[in-house]
């Protein structure tokens, strides 16, 4: 795999026989792996722009919450945060990221908690019907 930015190798804080590999990368470069990992290029440029803004907002929100500070990083590379894998960068996603550079969804001066999902099997439900809604 090829990743942008710097790779940091640190001992695991929970298991002395393991290491932790952390990719230190600028947010716009981070999005170049997240957007194509979360949404196919075939969805079109406007959908990719919306995805870029949602993904940027999500990452910034997690960063500001220091959700993983004790672990030494800001976001995970799985669906627990956003999928950040070795998906091939593509021109459409990169253009969408560049066209929305720096744009974040805000409420009361703070980034919103921009949760989204990449797979719904064609069905969604209003949050008010979810058994764990507030």
Predicted segments, located by residue:
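Conserved, single-site charged/polar hotspot
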Residues: 1-134
